[in-house]
């Protein structure tokens, strides 16, 4: 008889949709352990602007894969998949269920479908690219990438030499673009995955939540948090950490661009745009059960029934 794969739960949703609150309620009812799926929560010292769970919430429901990196460090979808699979195996070994919670859809996709193996770094080609950059400038190399791989060029900033160099290197080694290779699925996740997404039914309600949360962040000291990052000499606005929604707008304000009120407004607008992209991605997701942010009790019941039907007992 074939042994069943272990169960894992995905709880996705746009920013400010109530994912954390729902996850904590599940943690109190079932033997689940939470793994964060968020490209901003990985950074230490970025607590307020990321709406990171506070000490009380973490005491009720510890989260794995938060506060694992300094803001100066980079982290890829492949890094996340490796780390998440390790944490999931540890949770299952304890007889519990991995509950993956967050809004970084690329991480969920990488975990669920796997990633195609990219060619190993080639020091000779890497050096050629760096010499070209010294001679022509990174903008010229970005223009090259725009010609061969416009999709990657759109998401890689000209002032992000590490990712720009890698995209060009992959093409020169393999003859295929980074976009082509990453669209090829890798090894599927070795779990039975139940997938859920939570969001308000009305867009206006999500916008209201986003605005209220951003204003609360500012009241809680968000400006001071970004000032502490700004004061460091190893951080700059082209790093993935500083490009996080809210941080980039506050950083621009500290750089002398506009007023604080304008930075707050731009931060709210950027957060709305992020939520729109997240919802667009989720609408194309297969095998997804939607939950209503404004009816958390019903959401808990839906998840409870799904867990129970998969023969997982309550604690």
Curated annotation (Swiss-Prot):
Protein name, UniProt field: tRNA dimethylallyltransferase
Key words of the record: ATP-binding, Magnesium, Nucleotide-binding, Transferase, tRNA processing
Source species taxonomy: Bacteria, Pseudomonadati, Pseudomonadota, Gammaproteobacteria, Vibrionales
Residues engaged in binding substrate: 15-20
Residues that bind ATP: 13-20
Cofactor(s) listed: Mg(2+)
Top-rank taxon, per record: Bacteria
Family: Belongs to the IPP transferase family.
Record flagged with keyword Transferase: yes
UniProt function note: Catalyzes the transfer of a dimethylallyl group onto the adenine at position 37 in tRNAs that read codons beginning with uridine, leading to the formation of N6-(dimethylallyl)adenosine (i(6)A).
A biological process term (GO) from this entry: tRNA modification
Keyword Magnesium annotated: yes
Assigned EC number: 2.5.1.75
Catalysed reactions listed for this entry: adenosine(37) in tRNA + dimethylallyl diphosphate = N(6)-dimethylallyladenosine(37) in tRNA + diphosphate
Site, as annotated: Interaction with substrate tRNA: 104, 126
The protein's assembly and partners: Monomer.
Gene: miaA
Annotated spans, Interaction with substrate tRNA: 38-41, 162-166, 243-248, 276-283
GO molecular function per UniProt: ATP binding; tRNA dimethylallyltransferase activity
